[in-house]
């Protein structure tokens, strides 16, 4: 060990005496702890002072405070001195260590001297050296070993050599022989006969008690047995928790005890057995006793009791203590005794039962004790099971006395007695009788009916008075049968009731019905109740017989029941759930009207049931009838199902509707054949011999109208009669012809499998058909018509009969049309077979195909609710049937004339013009009105009669189209009144230039040729001559009749040649201030609620035809409700039925006219009487065209109402007007529109321009002598706007420099270059006056014209780049000038409004820039497009991006904003130069987006490339929520025929831009020439 220096205190410290070291340690304290003590003492004293001072006087407080401060000051001064001293304590420590070292050295010297002195005086005095062992040393040194150790060491340490395996085997075998000899020669107990000798020992095993091993230590006869091992086999597997019952110490004690006894015992083996047997029996009794106590504590409580326990001798347990207390037969009770045999202690434990049980059962119980599982619970369970079998056996014997021929069975554990009460009986319907294992009482239940109310009483009888069992079993049998009835009827339309409030007289036969009955209420028949009487068979009580009674009832009130019960009986237990109020009294009772008893055999063996079949073994049995009765072929039913009841209920439910139907038919005097069963018993059928002729429907008079009429007429007058609805007249020959074709009428009932409901099916079989159709199912001579109806309750059977008669009227009225039409279509003179094809005639509807290729259909049928004929138009390849818009007018015409031939001619002649008109787009548009969010229909078609309709354009202009014969139609301006052409209807505005526009499409050659051909082929007939002073007749004055063109005060148009009425007019039109009719005729007045703001309209509003017609849009969008802004058809009640009325007869249908009052529907103008024969009527309606009384000139008249004069056009010209085509000037881009829409749109834009000129202060209107030309002046420019004189389909502008005086400062006015003025003109032509026509575009353009010349000059430069993109060859971006706010722009101004705003020397405008493709294979549709709101500040001459501060600026927009700010900071402009166009030009040339890919030449110079630009188009990422692709550079936009493409309703984020509007639309943009059409332009 390396020595340590003394300064470190290593060695010296160990020599400090223990007491001194501890003393030094006790005198030391850490400085930190001392400071803590001082602070705690000070805080304590301060706390005590604060608590005590308030109780002292002022002087005492001062004294205490001074004493505290003085003591505390002194204490902390000491602490301060101590701390200062501790700063130099290192020197003191070093001195102390030196002194301690010196003290330890002196002590060391002193101790050494004392120890040496003690050794010299005490230890070394008696010290001696030992004698050396010379021999051992010599031996070790010479030989290297030592052999003289004592032998005891070897004996104690070195073990002897073990014996070999052979010696061991021989020894054990010899020992086995010795043991075997001793056992043979000795006295061995019978209980020890089970032993095994091996390995020199004998092992005795007594089952379930012990196992012991013994051996002998020699072969002498007197050598005692040696006890080797004891194993106690008694176990407690229930309460022992798997532990041994005997402790090891106990086993060792028994081992020593037995070993001591067998040493001196003559019979050692008997002594071993006796000791161990007694111990094991005592242990078994103790285990059983312990288990019994635990059973009592845990589960069985007081149900068992330990009566006596003698350890090692006896255990007595009693059970069924409740039965012992109640049963007088068991005074001693039920006990179980387990005891040892006192006479022979070698025997096992014995079990005694009180009362005693059979020997076999006793042996089984004894095995429970001697088994491996020693269990008192098991012993009790077995004993209770044996006792239960005995009790149930006794009960079975008693039940057999009154329940004979019943199959009893005792089974299960615990034991159960199964007693069937019915035959057949489900196992779950047996009475399960068992013994309560705890109490010994009998328990019973029916598993299927656990809630049976009879069970408690039956259980009480089983345990007490068994004389009531027979009665209770009978009641249970009835109760279960009632439940079977409920189960049987759960899927049938019937409910069971135990009681019903029936009211009947005292002597009524219903009282004879037994007490056990079931009331069955039919769900579908409230007036019928089925009573089922239940009886037991006398020969076999377990079988039931059923008797059925049908009871007719009616609801009865309390007063009715009292009147009945005054002399009778009321069997009511509870009020019925179905209570009705009549005369203020609730009807809670059911009065019995009649009672019918069913013959059960007849009811269950009628039609639809199986025939009894006899299984006969021999012919002799068949002849003599001997032997048992033949068995019916067994149909397997569940035991709970009562087939007789189900059959009777189903039969009643099936036949009662037929009975009620037959009764109602008899009441209506409709002959029928009664209820019959069809062949093969398939179903019931009710055949009607004939059906009555339909009666005209009557409109009942309302109570209020009747009261008002009675008040006006007085008490003596008759009440008003109900009004009869007009229906077709049924001639006798038509009726007879229909009845001849009607072969049979059958009524059947069926089940609708899909919805599981019953329904009526009425089959009408006709012979052939009057009209041969092309339908493949209508070719045979047997024509069946099937009518289906939901089966209503029996009390509503009259409604069902009414429905049959209504559908019969449907067939009859349609047959009246078909019967007349049959003769007309066969006549080749009328050429109807070439006009129309009969696709189907099913007696209920008629389907006709017409049109050029017979591709459109009309379905005609009689509507039983509306009491009129209905027409449904279908078909068409590209659009729906164009006649859908005229459906109401055509229906009214058909319901007035009842002539199919006229309808066919109307459909044939009007199909082509209506198909052309249907091509006009009826899509709603936004931003037309002052409120940009209100949609307005582009075209709204308003039918007024079968041959007259109005077409409204954007709710401003109106055209009136009249369809004429011979391929002609007339068009006039519908804004003018029909009476006074100088008067304008307030709803519309006259269309300026309409006459000139229409005259460009007049084909005079075709018009006159068709007139001459019509006159040559069909000369005027005296029958069809018109009154020269009359007006056009409804349809008769349109294209099928010749009419004269009247003057302005009586516009008379030729039309269909139908019969005209011959009565004078009775009033005038309240719409117009001037009317050609006298006001006083008949004293007629206008309707008080008539809307004076609307044009002439019928007094019944009718739905707009646009509701079902969208022919021009492939997308077929739903029409807008703005169709109501357009006027409806015109007609008044006095217009109909007069030849001299200037009105055309219009449809009596309803109108959607806003504010139109509801007035009586006018009747259409009648034609010839329907009594006339078809030949005369067709002569009247044959196609003729009479030459007009004046010629239509193409020269525009000088009158302002020139458009009010009709212009005749051919159908081809009308189709040209309405068909969408490209612009006549191909250099003007735009979508495909119809010429009519272009003309009206141009007129509309011109009118908007005129309105804006009058509103704006800076625009000065100039009077023009040319009609249709708008002149105005702005700043120093003069503008002229006019329609194209060639085609009148586009607006054009001419700009010229106006002569201006010098300015205030003497400078000449700015002279505009001709190139700038030309750009301005081209921009107006292609971007402003272009579709879609929006007022906001004109407003933006005119506001731009008001701006200063230097600003407008820059705007013109932007327009130049917009119109001619090729000028910016080096630009990275193309630009478009936006004039209308798109929905994808920043929400600065409302969508659809103007985009140029000037306020406080700041100008807001919008441009759209599109990235020029710069990568290989990059197309315009993949380019980025941004819509930028720009702000030009005229005060500071800065151009910036308009941004909203609260919004998060997109990355692309922020890049543009940063670029513009950089331009403002770095660019130096010329004096007086506007920064607007330079900023835009710099943006187009130098803007680079942060995520833009570099061109291919710069890819190598870039360290990392950014991600590719996301594709534009709808939904793509972009600055405004979507990227907008521009139009191709310098390319011609190929427009789309889809009218949806230019609808602002389709505008959305990501819409694309056309190259003629600068505005983002919602349609697809033409990415390349030939692509889809433009989006939403200006």
UniProtKB/Swiss-Prot annotation:
Single Gene Ontology MF annotation: transcription coregulator activity
Residue ranges with Pro residues bias: 1095-1104, 1157-1167
Chief site of localization: nucleus
Localization (cell): Nucleus
Polar residues: bias regions: 1084-1093
Placement of sequence motif LXXLL motif 2: 739-743
Region: Disordered, residue numbers: 561-582, 1009-1173, 1510-1578
Top-rank lineage group of the source organism: Eukaryota
Keywords recorded for this protein, A-Z: Activator, Nucleus, Repeat, Transcription, Transcription regulation
Tagged with keyword Transcription regulation: yes
GO biological process, one term: regulation of transcription by RNA polymerase II
Composition bias, Gly residues: 1510-1521, 1547-1578
InterPro entries: Med14_C (IPR056877), Med14_N (IPR055122), Med14_RM2 (IPR055113), Med14_RM6 (IPR055114), Med14_RM8 (IPR055107), Mediator_Med14 (IPR013947), RM3_Med14 (IPR056879), RM5_Med14 (IPR056878)
Short motif LXXLL motif 1, span: 49-53
Annotated Pfam families: Med14, Med14_C, RM2_Med14, RM3_Med14, RM5_Med14, RM6_Med14, RM8_Med14
GO cellular component: core mediator complex; mediator complex
Low complexity: compositionally biased ranges: 565-580
Assembly behavior: Component of the Mediator complex.
Family stated for the protein in its record: Belongs to the Mediator complex subunit 14 family.
Record's function text: Component of the Mediator complex, a coactivator involved in the regulated transcription of nearly all RNA polymerase II-dependent genes. Mediator functions as a bridge to convey information from gene-specific regulatory proteins to the basal RNA polymerase II transcription machinery. Mediator is recruited to promoters by direct interactions with regulatory proteins and serves as a scaffold for the assembly of a functional preinitiation complex with RNA polymerase II and the general transcription factors.
Protein name stated in the entry: Mediator of RNA polymerase II transcription subunit 14
């Amino acid at each position: 060990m390396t020595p340590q220096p003394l300064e470190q205190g290593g060695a010296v410290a160990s020599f400090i005496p223990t007491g001194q070291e501890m003393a030094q340690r006790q005198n030391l304290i850490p400085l930190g702890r001392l400071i803590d003590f001082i602070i705690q003492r000070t805080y304590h004293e301060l706390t005590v002072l604060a608590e005590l001072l308030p109780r002292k006087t002022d002087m005492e407080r001062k004294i205490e405070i001074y004493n505290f401060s003085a003591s505390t000051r002194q204490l902390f001064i000491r602490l301060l001195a101590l701390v200062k001293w501790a700063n130099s304590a290192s020197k003191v420590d070093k001195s102390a260590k030196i002194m301690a070292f010196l003290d330890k050295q002196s002590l060391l010297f002193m101790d050494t001297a004392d120890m040496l002195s003690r050794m010299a005086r005490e230890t070394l005095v008696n010290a001696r050296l030992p004698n050396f062992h010379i021999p051992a040393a010599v031996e070790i040194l010479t030989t290297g070993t030592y052999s003289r150790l004592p032998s005891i060491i070897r004996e104690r340490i070195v073990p002897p050599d073990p014996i070999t395996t052979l010696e061991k085997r021989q020894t054990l075998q010899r020992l086995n022989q010795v043991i075997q000899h001793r056992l043979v020669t000795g006295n061995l107990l019978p209980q020890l006969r089970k032993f095994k000798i091996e390995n020199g020992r004998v092992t005795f095993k007594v089952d379930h008690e012990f196992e012991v091993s013994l051996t002998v230590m020699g072969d002498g006869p007197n050598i005692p047995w040696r006890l080797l091992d004891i194993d106690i086999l008694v176990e407690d597997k229930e309460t022992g928790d798997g532990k041994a019952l005997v402790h090891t110490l106990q086993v060792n004690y028994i081992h020593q005890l037995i070993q001591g006894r067998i040493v001196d015992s003559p019979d050692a083996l008997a002594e071993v057995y006796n000791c161990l047997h007694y111990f094991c029996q005592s242990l078994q009794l103790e285990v059983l006793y312990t288990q019994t106590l635990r059973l009592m504590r845990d589960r069985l409580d007081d149900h068992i009791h330990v009566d006596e326990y003698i350890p090692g001798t006896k255990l007595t347990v009693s059970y069924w203590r409740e039965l012992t207390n109640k049963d007088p037969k068991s005074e001693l009770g039920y006990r179980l005794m387990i005891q040892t045999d006192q006479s022979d202690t070698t025997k096992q434990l014995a079990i005694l039962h009180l009362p005693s049980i059979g020997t076999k059962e006793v042996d089984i119980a004894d095995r429970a004790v001697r088994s491996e599982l020693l269990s008192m619970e098991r012993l009790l369970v077995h004993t209770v099971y044996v006792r239960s079998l005995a009790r149930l056996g006794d009960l079975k014997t008693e039940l057999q006395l009154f329940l004979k021929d019943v199959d009893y069975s005792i089974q299960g554990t615990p034991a159960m007695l199964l007693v069937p009460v019915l035959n057949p009986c489900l196992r779950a319907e047996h009475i399960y009788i068992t013994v309560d294992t705890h109490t010994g009482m009998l328990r019973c239940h029916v598993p299927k009916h656990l809630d049976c109310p009879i069970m408690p009483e039956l259980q009480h009888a089983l345990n007490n008075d068994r004389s009531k069992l027979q009665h209770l079993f009978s009641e249970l049998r009835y109760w279960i049968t009632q439940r079977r009835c409920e189960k049987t009827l759960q899927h049938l339309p019937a409910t069971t009731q135990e009681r019903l409030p029936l009211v009947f007289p005292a002597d009524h036969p219903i009282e004879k019905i037994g007490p056990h009955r079931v009331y069955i209420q039919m769900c579908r028949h409230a007036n019928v109740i089925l009573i089922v009487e239940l009886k037991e068979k006398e020969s076999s009580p377990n079988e039931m017989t059923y008797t059925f009674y049908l009871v007719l009832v009616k609801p009865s009130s309390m007063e009715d029941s009292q009147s009945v019960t005054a002399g009778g009986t009321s069997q009511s237990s509870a009020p019925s759930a179905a209570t009705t109020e009549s005369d203020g009294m609730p009807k809670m009772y059911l009065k019995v009207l009649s009672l019918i008893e069913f013959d059960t055999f007849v009811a269950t063996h009628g039609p639809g049931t199986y025939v009894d079949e006899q299984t006969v073994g021999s012919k002799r049995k068949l002849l003599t009838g001997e032997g048992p009765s033949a068995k019916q072929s067994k149909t397997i039913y569940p035991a709970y199902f009562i087939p007789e009841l189900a059959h009777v209920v189903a039969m009643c439910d099936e036949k009662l509707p037929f009975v009620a139907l037959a009764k109602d038919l008899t009441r209506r005097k409709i002959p029928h054949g009664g209820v019959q069963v069809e062949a093969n018993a398939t179903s019931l059928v009710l055949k009607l011999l004939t059906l009555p002729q339909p009666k005209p429907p009557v409109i009942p008079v309302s109570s209020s109208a009747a009261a008002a009429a009675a008040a006006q007429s007085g008490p003596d007058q008759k009440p008003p009669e109900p009004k009869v609805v007009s229906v077709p007249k049924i001639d006798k020959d038509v009726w007879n012809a229909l009845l001849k074709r009607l072969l049979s009428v059958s009524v059947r009932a069926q089940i609708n499998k899909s919805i599981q409901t019953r329904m009526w099916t009425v089959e009408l079989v006709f012979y052939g058909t009057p009209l041969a159709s092309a339908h493949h199912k209508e070719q045979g001579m047997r024509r069946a018509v099937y009518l289906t109806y939901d089966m209503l309750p029996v009390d509503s059977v009259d409604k069902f009969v009414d429905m049959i008669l209504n559908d019969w009227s449907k067939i009859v009225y349609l047959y009246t049309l078909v019967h007349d039409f049959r003769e007309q279509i066969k006549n080749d003179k009328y050429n109807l077979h070439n006009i129309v094809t009969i696709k189907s005639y099913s007696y209920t509807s008629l389907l006709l195909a017409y049109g050029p290729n017979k591709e459109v259909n009309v379905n005609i049928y009689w509507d039983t609710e509306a009491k009129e004929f209905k027409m449904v138009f279908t078909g068409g390849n590209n659009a729906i049937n164009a006649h859908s818009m005229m459906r109401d007018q055509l229906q009214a015409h058909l319901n007035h004339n009842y002539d199919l031939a006229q309808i066919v001619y109307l459909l044939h002649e009007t199909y082509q013009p209506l198909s052309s008109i249907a091509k006009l787009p009826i899509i709603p548009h936004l931003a037309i009105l002052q409120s940009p969010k209100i949609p307005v229909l582009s075209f709204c078609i308003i039918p007024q009669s079968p041959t007259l309709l109005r077409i409204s354009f954007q709710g401003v202009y109106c055209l009136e189209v009249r369809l004429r014969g011979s391929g002609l139609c007339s068009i006039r301006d519908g804004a003018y009144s029909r009476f006074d052409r100088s008067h304008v209807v307030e709803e519309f505005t006259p269309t300026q230039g309409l006459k000139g526009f229409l005259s460009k499409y007049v084909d005079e050659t075709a018009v006159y040729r068709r007139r001459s051909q019509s006159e040559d082929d069909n000369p005027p007939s005296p029958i069809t001559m018109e009154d020269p002073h009359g007006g056009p007749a409804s349809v008769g004055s349109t294209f099928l009749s010749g009419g004269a063109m009247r003057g302005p005060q009586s516009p008379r148009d030729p039309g269909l040649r139908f019969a005209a009425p011959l009565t004078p007019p009775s009033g005038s039109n309240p719409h117009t201030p001037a009317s050609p009719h006298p006001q006083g005729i008949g004293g007629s007045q206008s309707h008080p609620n008539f809307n004076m703001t609307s044009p002439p309209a019928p007094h019944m509003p009718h739905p707009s035809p646009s509701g079902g017609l969208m022919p021009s849009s492939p997308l077929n969008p739903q029409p807008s409700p703005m169709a109501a802004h357009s006027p409806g058809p015109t007609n008044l009640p006095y217009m109909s039925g007069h030849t001299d009325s200037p009105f055309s007869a219009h449809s009596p249908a309803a109108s959607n006219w806003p504010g139109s009052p509801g007035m009586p529907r006018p009747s259409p103008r009648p034609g010839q009487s329907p009594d006339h024969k078809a030949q005369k009527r067709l002569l009247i309606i044959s196609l003729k065209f009479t030459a007009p009384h004046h010629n239509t000139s193409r020269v525009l008249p000088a009158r302002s109402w020139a458009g009010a004069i009709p212009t005749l056009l051919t159908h081809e010209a009308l189709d040209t007007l309405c068909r969408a085509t490209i612009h006549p000037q191909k250099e003007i881009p735009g979508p495909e529109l119809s010429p009519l829409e272009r003309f009206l749109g141009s007129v509309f834009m011109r009118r908007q321009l005129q309105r804006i000129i009058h509103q704006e202060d800076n625009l000065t209107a100039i009077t023009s002598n040319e009609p249709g030309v708008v002149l105005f002046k702005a700043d120093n420019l003069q503008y002229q706007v006019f329609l194209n004189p060639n085609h009148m389909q586009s607006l054009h502008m001419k700009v010229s420099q106006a002569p201006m005086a010098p300015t205030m400062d003497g400078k000449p006015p700015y002279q505009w270059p001709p190139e700038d003025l030309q750009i301005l003109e081209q921009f107006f032509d292609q971007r402003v006056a272009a579709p879609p026509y929006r007022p906001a575009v004109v407003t933006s353009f005119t506001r731009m014209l008001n701006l200063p010349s230097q600003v407008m000059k820059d705007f013109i430069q932007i327009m130049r780049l917009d119109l001619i993109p090729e000028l910016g060859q080096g630009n990275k971006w193309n630009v478009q000038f936006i004039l209308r706010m798109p929905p994808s722009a920043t929400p600065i101004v409302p969508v659809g409004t103007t985009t140029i705003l000037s306020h406080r020397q700041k100008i807001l405008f919008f441009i759209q820039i599109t990235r020029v493709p710069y990568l290989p294979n990059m197309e315009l549709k993949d380019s980025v497009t941004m819509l930028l709101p720009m702000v030009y500040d005229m005060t500071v001459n800065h151009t910036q991006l308009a941004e909203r501060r609260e919004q998060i600026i997109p990355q692309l927009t922020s890049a543009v904003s940063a670029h513009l700010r950089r331009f403002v900071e770095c660019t130096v402009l010329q004096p007086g130069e506007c920064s607007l166009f330079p900023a835009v030009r710099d943006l187009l040339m130098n803007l680079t987006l942060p995520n833009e890919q570099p061109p291919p030449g710069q890819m190598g110079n870039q360290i990392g490339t950014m991600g590719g630009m996301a594709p534009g188009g709808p939904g793509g990422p972009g600055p405004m929520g979507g990227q907008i692709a521009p139009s191709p550079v310098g390319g011609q936009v190929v427009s789309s025929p889809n009218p949806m493409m230019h609808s602002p309703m389709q505008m959305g984020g990501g819409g694309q831009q056309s190259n003629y509007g600068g505005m983002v639309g919602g349609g697809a943009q033409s990415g390349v020439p030939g692509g889809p059409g433009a989006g939403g332009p200006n």
